[in-house]
């Protein structure tokens, strides 16, 4: 009996040792797992931070390169646009960028000064042009004739001169229409800036003034050509009014 009790006690003791060892190993394993997870997270964060820093540097370098290339492209584009304007408009750019060299009407001069005061942001300027287009007065359908249509525009455009005598002089007020948002804004700039003046004053205006506003920087070549066609149509009407040709 005594031996059996000793054996049972030893077995229970051994089982307790095994159980206790198992518990300790489990805790150690959990601690190791937590430690490993912590190390993995810390390693991931360090690598992620390195990656973000590297990515930021790359973006910064790309931005510098883009700005540098943009400045070069823009310089070439401005020179190219001058050549295009000179050839299409038949008017030469003045030797200096003085606003008075373009023979602008007071209204057009005010418009140029407004666009010059805006930030040099093509999108921002294009939105202002579109907003200006909403100021166009409706044109009666009977005036939307072939004779009043501006050909060679990307959008449909009509221009019509309303002539009145003022101080024994012929003064023109213009009506304009376009189904294109951006083109409509350009139409408004022209009809507003050239309304209330004599045909002689209108004919003196150098169409290349659009380059002073920065608008030509974001126009496609087809829209630049369309703008010059609108100006040409206005000048043809002005010449006809001087010659007493009725509309």
UniProtKB/Swiss-Prot annotation:
Participates in sulfur mobilization (SUF) pathway for iron-sulfur (Fe-S) cluster biogenesis. Enhances cysteine desulfurase activity of SufS. Probably functions as a sulfur acceptor for SufS. It is found in: Plastid, Apicoplast. The lineage of its organism: Eukaryota, Sar, Alveolata, Apicomplexa, Aconoidasida. This is Putative cysteine desulfuration protein SufE. GO terms for cellular component: apicoplast. Disruption phenotype: Essential for parasite survival. Pathway: Cofactor biosynthesis; iron-sulfur cluster biosynthesis. It comes from the Eukaryota. Monomer. Interacts with SufS; interaction enhances cysteine desulfurase activity of SufS. The active site is at residue 153. Belongs to the SufE family.
């Amino acid at each position: 009996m005594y031996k059996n009790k000793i054996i049972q006690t030893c077995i229970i003791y051994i089982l307790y040792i095994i159980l206790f060892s198992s518990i300790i190993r489990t805790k150690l394993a959990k601690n190791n797992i937590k430690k490993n997870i912590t190390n993995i997270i810390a390693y991931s964060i360090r690598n992620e931070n390195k990656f973000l820093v590297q990515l930021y540097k790359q973006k910064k370098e790309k931005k510098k390169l883009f700005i540098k290339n943009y400045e070069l492209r823009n310089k070439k584009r401005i020179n190219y646009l001058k050549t295009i304007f000179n050839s299409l408009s038949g008017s030469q750019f003045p030797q200096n960028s003085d606003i008075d060299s373009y023979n602008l009407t007071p209204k057009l001069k005010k418009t140029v000064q407004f666009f010059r005061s805006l930030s040099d942001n093509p999108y921002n300027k294009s939105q202002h042009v579109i907003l200006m287009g909403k100021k166009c007065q409706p044109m009666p359908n009977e005036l939307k004739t072939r004779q009043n249509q501006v050909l060679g525009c990307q959008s449909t455009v009509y221009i019509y001169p309303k002539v009145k005598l003022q101080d024994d002089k012929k003064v023109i007020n213009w009506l304009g229409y376009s189904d294109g948002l951006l083109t409509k804004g350009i139409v408004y700039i022209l009809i507003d800036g050239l309304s209330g003046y004599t045909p002689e004053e209108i004919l003196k205006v150098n169409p290349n003034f659009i380059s002073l506003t920065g608008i030509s920087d974001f126009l496609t070549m087809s829209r630049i050509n369309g703008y010059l066609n609108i100006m040409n149509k206005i000048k043809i009407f002005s010449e006809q009014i001087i010659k007493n040709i009725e509309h």
